A protein has these predicted regions:
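A conserved acidic beta->alpha catalytic loop
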Residues: 45-54, 73
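Catalytic core of nucleotide-sugar-dependent glycosyltransferases
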Residues: 211-220, 225-254, 259, 270, ...
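Membrane-interface aromatic/basic loop that binds lipid-linked glycans or pyrophosphate carriers
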Residues: 276-356
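Short, well-formed alpha-helical segments that are part of the catalytic scaffolds
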Residues: 19-33
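Short loop->beta transition adjacent to catalytic acidic/histidine clusters or analogous donor-positioning motifs
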Residues: 8-11, 32-43, 51, 63-67
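Short aromatic/hydrophobic "clamp" motif used to bind/position activated sugar donors
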Residues: 92
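Donor-binding/catalytic cores of nucleotide-activated saccharide
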Residues: 76, 97-209, 214-230
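Glycine-rich, basic loop-to-helix element that forms the pyrophosphate-binding segment
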Residues: 70-87, 97
Length: 356
């Protein structure tokens, strides 16, 4: 395919917006300045109380490819769904309104690799922006060459490295999403993790770019970093949605047992950490939330299956093997207070930052 033919492929960029006046200019400028010009940029405003709509309207008046629409106020997942239904592009890119693209050629690189490999999803590396410092995240090269059906690919892709979990930093083939009717579920947060797991279960073909294609601004006010009392319910809702999706697509549930187990371990750890921070480092608060996970029938089944598993975990990192086995055993035997102490130690040593 020639360069001209590739430029004929349209990319739809979908951006949910809520109170993003501080960063939205930088976000839009990084997209407008892309060397790849066949774009439509759809911004869905979710009832911003600041000047975000005014700023976007000025861009909209200047750039015909920019379109702002009114959202339902139900969160980023619903906004992305609205954008997906309006999108006319051959490919989809999601971005958050407080992040930006550091490479003006990243869309060209996405398209080139997608067309060369016939990939459904092209994944780039990313970096975090934290207190004015760029911190490169763990790169996906450690699992990119693994078979997508392997435990290593799933574990690193969605958890220890985590690159596959996020909606951003990727190029999606719209036809793939449309054919499989993949949309964002109605969740309080982590809807992008479920979205990408649904893509994975539908046997998406992946291609990986070594380039850093996205800068994620770590924002303590983001939903992802805030304490939520409904968090346990949200994670179990995600798991139930995932199990329903596996059944809907006529997949063997046994193939995804470890995926669900890992998901619940990471969810329980994350919620334990948030309870610890929210309640002045109270071990009893952590114990209480771990008990919620261990008492849920689906959680108990998942932790017990991982703890009783005879086959060795097909994960290369020994530390992760030890942590997964220890956590699942602790949850199986209801050692909630002991597990709470373990979470305290990991948070104190800042190991938790690698799990976020």
């Amino acid at each position: 395919m020639t360069a001209l033919e590739k430029q004929q492929k349209k990319i739809s960029v979908i951006i949910p917006v809520y109170n993003a006046e501080k960063y939205i200019r930088e976000t839009l400028d990084s997209i407008i300045k892309q060397s790849y010009k066949n774009l439509e940029i759809i911004l869905i405003d979710n009832g911003s109380k600041d000047r975000s709509p005014d700023i976007i309207q000025k861009y909209e008046a200047k750039y015909p490819e920019i379109h702002m629409i009114e959202g339902s106020g139900k969160g980023p997942g619903a906004s992305r769904n609205r954008g997906l239904k309006l999108a006319k592009g051959d490919y989809i890119v999601f971005a958050d309104a407080d992040d930006y693209l550091p490479d003006k050629d990243i869309f060209c690189k996405y398209i080139n690799l997608a067309e060369q490999t016939d990939a459904d999803i092209v994944v780039s590396n990313y970096a975090r922006l934290w207190k004015d410092k760029i911190l490169p995240a763990t790169k996906h090269q450690s699992f990119a060459l693994c078979s997508p059906s392997s435990e290593e690919f799933r574990f690193q892709g969605f958890f220890s490295v985590g690159t596959l979990s996020y909606a951003w930093g990727k190029l999606y083939r719209r036809e793939f999403l449309r054919n499989h009717q993949i949309y964002f579920a109605d969740l309080s947060y982590a809807e992008d993790k479920l979205f990408n797991m649904q893509c994975y279960i539908c046997d998406a073909k992946y291609a990986f770019l070594e380039d850093i294609g996205y800068i994620y601004r770590k924002n303590d006010m983001s939903v992802s970093w805030q304490y939520r009392p409904d968090s346990v319910e949200n994670w179990f809702k995600l798991v139930y949605e995932l199990k329903s999706w596996i059944e809907k697509k006529d997949k063997d549930p046994k193939e995804y047992t470890s995926l669900i187990g890992y998901l619940l371990i990471f969810a329980a750890f994350f919620d334990g950490k948030m309870e610890y921070m929210q309640h002045k480092k109270s071990l009893w608060a952590v114990r209480k939330v771990l008990k919620k996970y261990g008492s849920n029938p689906m959680g108990r089944k998942a932790f017990t299956e991982l703890a009783d598993r005879r086959k060795k975990l097909q994960i290369t990192q020994k530390l992760w093997k030890i942590m997964i086995r220890t956590f699942s055993l602790g949850m199986k035997w209801r050692w909630y207070l002991l597990m709470s102490v373990g979470i305290k130690i990991l948070v104190s040593c800042r190991v938790d930052e690698r799990l976020s």
